[in-house]
Amino acid sequence: MVDYSVWDHIEVSDDEDETHPNIDTASLFRWRHQARVERMEQFQKEKEELDKGCRECKRKLAECQKKLKELEVAEPGGGSGGGRGERERLQAEAQQLRHEERNWESKMEELRKKEKNMPWNVHTLSKDGFSKSVFNVKAEEKEETEEQKEQKHKTFVERHEKQIKHFGMLRRWDDSQKYLSDNPHLVCEETANYLVIWCIDLEVEEKQALMEQVAHQTIVMQFILELAKSLKVDPRACFRQFFTKIKTADQQYMEGFNDELEAFKERVRGRAKARIERAMREYEEEERQKRLGPGGLDPVDVYESLPPELQKCFDAKDVQMLQDTISRMDPTEAKYHMQRCIDSGLWVPNAKAAAEGGGQGGAHGQPGGADSEALYEEIPKESGEEEGGEGKA
């Protein structure tokens, strides 16, 4: 049977309570509320003091019993007179503390009864059943760094490169679906990335037919990954759904697939072309660095910057013609051009002496079709003009 007596004394103010006309209702409610809060604070303070006193008494009793036990262990037979007196003192203290403990517990029990009989109010009418809620939420995934992604891709390729290439060579929908069913670990971003790189490599190697075959499987994998993102599921859980959809798709869906395939092949061709051009630039720069003369100038660039009459001298490999041409030029201009020829290695001073001495100093062949092994003698120092035109380093 339900006991409804607990509802008989509820101390809750009601705006509809009747009050005397000469009494301000709002002030009366405010006074009642303040008095109720003060009573609750006083009761809470009394409860805390009793609880603190009870815990302190228990602590002292436990400490006294511990000392008494240590004394009994140290002097099991009762010990000397001093030890016996200490034991009696501790026993008396323990007895007194037990009596105090019972008093504290009695006061606590009276306080609990008092609390139980107190009328309910807006503060005590209900209590929290729990103070927190726990939800099973998916842990936030930390974004991988570029180094982690690269290492993950490298490890995956080392383990499954043969299987990825086998998938890339398939063509029929049923064959692709069956192979992925047997190897579901291939349905991932790493497989798609490897196929993209493979397509570019094949285009660079001018294997266009094979590139188009692998490109088809690349788009298949990318469509599966996009479907997984849209459905917010693991790609391995939806690749069968993709094949079911693609095999029964309408003309518009197939056109979308084919358009994406053609656009991808164009991007592959563009990337392959850019890679080839970059490789050619690197090769040309490497060759240019090899050609640089002792002064850090490129002989090709220097030759092309020479006046036509000087270019003819290098083309003909005629030292006398070179001397005559320099003698007719302005000394400052002649010195400028010849110094550039020396810095680029196009002209090597004392070439004959260096060759006879077994040195490495030999004139570089000029880039006008002349033999690169040819050696040029230094211009004779007979005239001031020729000496100035030689432009010694």
Swiss-Prot record:
Pfam families referenced in this protein's UniProt entry, alphabetically: CDC37_C (PF08564), CDC37_M (PF08565), CDC37_N (PF03234)
Record's protein name: Hsp90 co-chaperone Cdc37
A molecular function GO annotation: heat shock protein binding
Return the similarity comment: Belongs to the CDC37 family.
Q: Say where the protein is mainly found.
A: cytoplasm
Complex and partners: Forms a complex with Hsp90.
- List S-S links within the chain: none
Stretches with biased composition (Basic and acidic residues): 378-393
